[in-house]
Amino acid sequence: MRRVETDARPFSAATLPVWAGPAERLRFLLGYAVLAPSRHNVQPWAFEIEGDEVRLFGDFRRALHVVDPRDRELIMSCGAALLNLRVAAAHFGYATSVEVVAGSRRDGMLARVRLEERRSTTPQIEELFRAIPHRRTNRLPLDSREPPPGLVAELAREAALEGGMLRPVGESVRRAVAELVAEGDRLQWRNPRFRAELSAWTRSNATRRLDGMPGFARGMSDAASWVQPVLVRLADAGHV
Protein backbone atom coordinates (compact mmCIF):
# COMPACT_ATOMS: atom_id res chain seq x y z
CA MET A 1 0.00 0.00 0.00
CA ARG A 2 1.36 3.41 -0.97
CA ARG A 3 0.25 6.79 0.34
CA VAL A 4 0.35 9.19 -2.60
CA GLU A 5 1.65 12.75 -2.33
CA THR A 6 -1.21 15.07 -3.20
CA ASP A 7 0.05 18.63 -3.56
CA ALA A 8 -1.36 20.25 -6.69
CA ARG A 9 1.91 20.65 -8.57
CA PRO A 10 2.47 22.64 -11.78
CA PHE A 11 0.71 20.57 -14.40
CA SER A 12 1.48 19.58 -17.96
CA ALA A 13 -0.71 17.34 -20.06
CA ALA A 14 0.61 13.87 -20.75
CA THR A 15 -0.48 10.56 -22.21
CA LEU A 16 -1.24 7.59 -20.03
CA PRO A 17 1.54 5.06 -20.74
CA VAL A 18 0.15 1.98 -22.48
CA TRP A 19 2.55 -0.25 -20.54
CA ALA A 20 1.44 1.02 -17.14
CA GLY A 21 0.02 -1.43 -14.64
CA PRO A 22 -3.06 -0.65 -12.49
CA ALA A 23 -1.13 1.17 -9.74
CA GLU A 24 0.82 3.27 -12.26
CA ARG A 25 -2.38 4.18 -14.11
CA LEU A 26 -4.04 5.28 -10.88
CA ARG A 27 -1.04 7.32 -9.79
CA PHE A 28 -1.05 9.05 -13.20
CA LEU A 29 -4.77 9.85 -12.96
CA LEU A 30 -4.36 11.33 -9.49
CA GLY A 31 -2.38 14.11 -11.15
CA TYR A 32 -5.75 15.34 -12.42
CA ALA A 33 -7.67 14.59 -9.21
CA VAL A 34 -5.54 16.95 -7.10
CA LEU A 35 -6.30 19.92 -9.37
CA ALA A 36 -9.74 20.13 -7.76
CA PRO A 37 -10.84 23.29 -5.90
CA SER A 38 -10.93 23.60 -2.11
CA ARG A 39 -11.71 26.32 0.43
CA HIS A 40 -8.59 28.44 1.03
CA ASN A 41 -6.84 26.00 -1.35
CA VAL A 42 -6.13 23.72 1.62
CA GLN A 43 -6.27 20.58 -0.59
CA PRO A 44 -7.82 18.43 2.18
CA TRP A 45 -7.47 15.02 0.56
CA ALA A 46 -5.13 12.06 0.65
CA PHE A 47 -4.96 8.92 -1.47
CA GLU A 48 -3.68 5.39 -0.98
CA ILE A 49 -3.09 2.94 -3.81
CA GLU A 50 -3.21 -0.79 -3.25
CA GLY A 51 -3.16 -2.99 -6.33
CA ASP A 52 -5.89 -1.82 -8.70
CA GLU A 53 -7.71 0.25 -6.08
CA VAL A 54 -7.25 3.83 -4.92
CA ARG A 55 -8.75 5.00 -1.65
CA LEU A 56 -9.76 8.58 -1.04
CA PHE A 57 -9.37 9.99 2.47
CA GLY A 58 -10.24 13.31 3.98
CA ASP A 59 -7.05 14.86 5.36
CA PHE A 60 -8.47 16.33 8.55
CA ARG A 61 -5.11 17.82 9.48
CA ARG A 62 -6.06 20.42 6.86
CA ALA A 63 -9.57 20.96 8.19
CA LEU A 64 -10.78 24.53 8.68
CA HIS A 65 -12.22 24.25 12.17
CA VAL A 66 -13.57 27.80 12.30
CA VAL A 67 -15.03 28.45 8.88
CA ASP A 68 -15.99 24.81 8.21
CA PRO A 69 -16.71 23.32 11.66
CA ARG A 70 -18.73 20.37 10.33
CA ASP A 71 -16.23 19.55 7.55
CA ARG A 72 -18.95 20.09 4.95
CA GLU A 73 -16.69 21.95 2.53
CA LEU A 74 -13.84 19.52 3.19
CA ILE A 75 -16.07 16.65 2.02
CA MET A 76 -17.22 18.67 -1.00
CA SER A 77 -13.61 19.33 -1.96
CA CYS A 78 -12.82 15.62 -1.76
CA GLY A 79 -15.88 14.99 -3.93
CA ALA A 80 -14.49 17.42 -6.51
CA ALA A 81 -11.18 15.51 -6.51
CA LEU A 82 -13.12 12.27 -6.97
CA LEU A 83 -14.99 13.74 -9.95
CA ASN A 84 -11.73 14.86 -11.56
CA LEU A 85 -10.40 11.32 -11.14
CA ARG A 86 -13.50 9.84 -12.80
CA VAL A 87 -13.38 12.34 -15.67
CA ALA A 88 -9.67 11.73 -16.30
CA ALA A 89 -10.20 7.97 -16.25
CA ALA A 90 -13.05 8.27 -18.76
CA HIS A 91 -10.94 10.49 -21.02
CA PHE A 92 -8.19 7.87 -21.12
CA GLY A 93 -10.71 5.14 -21.88
CA TYR A 94 -11.57 3.57 -18.52
CA ALA A 95 -14.83 3.17 -16.69
CA THR A 96 -14.64 3.49 -12.91
CA SER A 97 -16.27 1.59 -10.10
CA VAL A 98 -16.81 3.93 -7.15
CA GLU A 99 -17.84 2.89 -3.66
CA VAL A 100 -18.71 5.82 -1.43
CA VAL A 101 -18.04 4.95 2.20
CA ALA A 102 -21.10 5.84 4.25
CA GLY A 103 -20.83 7.30 7.73
CA SER A 104 -17.76 8.55 9.54
CA ARG A 105 -14.69 6.34 9.79
CA ARG A 106 -11.83 6.84 12.19
CA ASP A 107 -9.32 6.72 9.33
CA GLY A 108 -11.24 9.32 7.30
CA MET A 109 -11.78 7.12 4.24
CA LEU A 110 -14.49 8.50 1.96
CA ALA A 111 -14.42 6.35 -1.18
CA ARG A 112 -12.81 3.46 -3.04
CA VAL A 113 -12.22 3.61 -6.80
CA ARG A 114 -11.27 0.86 -9.25
CA LEU A 115 -10.61 1.08 -12.96
CA GLU A 116 -12.94 -1.15 -14.93
CA GLU A 117 -13.26 -2.20 -18.57
CA ARG A 118 -12.25 -0.01 -21.47
CA ARG A 119 -14.92 2.38 -22.67
CA SER A 120 -15.40 5.17 -25.17
CA THR A 121 -15.32 8.79 -24.08
CA THR A 122 -18.06 11.33 -24.84
CA PRO A 123 -18.10 14.99 -25.91
CA GLN A 124 -19.30 15.96 -22.43
CA ILE A 125 -16.40 14.11 -20.79
CA GLU A 126 -13.92 15.71 -23.15
CA GLU A 127 -15.24 19.18 -22.37
CA LEU A 128 -14.87 18.54 -18.64
CA PHE A 129 -11.42 17.01 -19.07
CA ARG A 130 -10.10 20.00 -21.02
CA ALA A 131 -11.29 22.29 -18.23
CA ILE A 132 -9.43 20.48 -15.41
CA PRO A 133 -5.95 22.03 -15.85
CA HIS A 134 -7.42 25.47 -16.63
CA ARG A 135 -9.84 25.74 -13.70
CA ARG A 136 -9.07 28.54 -11.27
CA THR A 137 -10.92 29.83 -8.24
CA ASN A 138 -11.84 33.43 -8.93
CA ARG A 139 -11.13 35.47 -5.78
CA LEU A 140 -11.56 38.79 -7.59
CA PRO A 141 -14.82 40.79 -7.83
CA LEU A 142 -17.26 39.26 -10.27
CA ASP A 143 -18.39 41.12 -13.36
CA SER A 144 -21.99 41.81 -14.30
CA ARG A 145 -22.28 39.43 -17.24
CA GLU A 146 -25.23 37.05 -17.20
CA PRO A 147 -24.52 33.35 -17.81
CA PRO A 148 -25.22 32.12 -21.35
CA PRO A 149 -28.82 31.09 -22.01
CA GLY A 150 -29.56 27.57 -20.81
CA LEU A 151 -26.35 27.18 -18.80
CA VAL A 152 -27.97 27.39 -15.35
CA ALA A 153 -30.59 24.81 -16.30
CA GLU A 154 -27.87 22.53 -17.67
CA LEU A 155 -25.87 22.85 -14.45
CA ALA A 156 -28.98 21.99 -12.42
CA ARG A 157 -29.48 18.83 -14.50
CA GLU A 158 -25.84 17.82 -14.03
CA ALA A 159 -26.10 18.38 -10.27
CA ALA A 160 -29.16 16.12 -10.13
CA LEU A 161 -27.28 13.35 -11.96
CA GLU A 162 -24.68 13.43 -9.15
CA GLY A 163 -27.34 13.30 -6.43
CA GLY A 164 -27.11 17.01 -5.65
CA MET A 165 -29.32 20.04 -6.12
CA LEU A 166 -28.55 23.39 -7.72
CA ARG A 167 -31.20 25.95 -6.90
CA PRO A 168 -30.94 29.17 -8.92
CA VAL A 169 -31.62 32.37 -7.00
CA GLY A 170 -34.18 34.51 -8.78
CA GLU A 171 -34.14 38.28 -8.96
CA SER A 172 -36.91 38.55 -6.36
CA VAL A 173 -34.78 37.04 -3.58
CA ARG A 174 -31.29 37.94 -4.81
CA ARG A 175 -31.01 41.06 -2.64
CA ALA A 176 -32.15 39.17 0.47
CA VAL A 177 -29.55 36.47 -0.14
CA ALA A 178 -26.85 39.10 -0.73
CA GLU A 179 -27.71 40.81 2.56
CA LEU A 180 -27.48 37.50 4.44
CA VAL A 181 -24.09 36.79 2.88
CA ALA A 182 -22.85 40.28 3.77
CA GLU A 183 -24.01 39.91 7.37
CA GLY A 184 -22.30 36.51 7.57
CA ASP A 185 -19.07 38.11 6.33
CA ARG A 186 -19.29 40.82 8.99
CA LEU A 187 -19.83 38.25 11.75
CA GLN A 188 -16.88 36.18 10.58
CA TRP A 189 -14.50 39.13 10.37
CA ARG A 190 -15.35 40.10 13.94
CA ASN A 191 -14.10 36.70 15.08
CA PRO A 192 -10.33 36.70 15.77
CA ARG A 193 -10.22 32.90 15.38
CA PHE A 194 -11.62 33.22 11.86
CA ARG A 195 -9.02 35.85 10.98
CA ALA A 196 -6.18 33.74 12.42
CA GLU A 197 -7.29 30.71 10.41
CA LEU A 198 -7.57 32.72 7.20
CA SER A 199 -4.17 34.32 7.83
CA ALA A 200 -2.57 30.89 8.24
CA TRP A 201 -3.52 30.01 4.65
CA THR A 202 -2.66 33.41 3.15
CA ARG A 203 0.61 33.49 1.21
CA SER A 204 2.86 36.12 -0.32
CA ASN A 205 3.41 36.20 -4.07
CA ALA A 206 6.90 34.79 -3.53
CA THR A 207 5.68 31.66 -1.76
CA ARG A 208 7.04 28.27 -2.74
CA ARG A 209 4.12 26.56 -1.05
CA LEU A 210 1.68 24.77 -3.34
CA ASP A 211 -1.30 25.26 -1.06
CA GLY A 212 -2.99 28.32 0.38
CA MET A 213 -3.85 31.60 -1.31
CA PRO A 214 -1.08 33.81 -2.74
CA GLY A 215 -1.70 37.51 -3.02
CA PHE A 216 -1.85 37.50 -6.82
CA ALA A 217 -5.02 35.38 -6.58
CA ARG A 218 -6.66 38.54 -5.21
CA GLY A 219 -4.90 40.89 -7.61
CA MET A 220 -2.32 42.08 -5.06
CA SER A 221 1.10 43.48 -5.81
CA ASP A 222 4.20 41.73 -4.49
CA ALA A 223 4.65 44.34 -1.76
CA ALA A 224 1.04 44.15 -0.60
CA SER A 225 1.14 40.36 -0.53
CA TRP A 226 3.93 40.39 2.08
CA VAL A 227 1.84 42.30 4.62
CA GLN A 228 -1.48 40.68 3.75
CA PRO A 229 -1.25 37.79 6.30
CA VAL A 230 -0.58 40.25 9.15
CA LEU A 231 -3.39 42.57 8.09
CA VAL A 232 -5.83 39.68 7.80
CA ARG A 233 -4.98 38.50 11.30
CA LEU A 234 -5.17 41.92 12.96
CA ALA A 235 -7.78 43.89 11.01
CA ASP A 236 -11.26 43.65 12.52
CA ALA A 237 -13.07 44.34 9.26
CA GLY A 238 -16.39 43.24 10.75
CA HIS A 239 -16.82 46.67 12.34
CA VAL A 240 -15.82 48.69 9.28
Residue ranges, per PLM feature:
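Acidic, surface-exposed loops and disordered segments
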Residues: 1-240
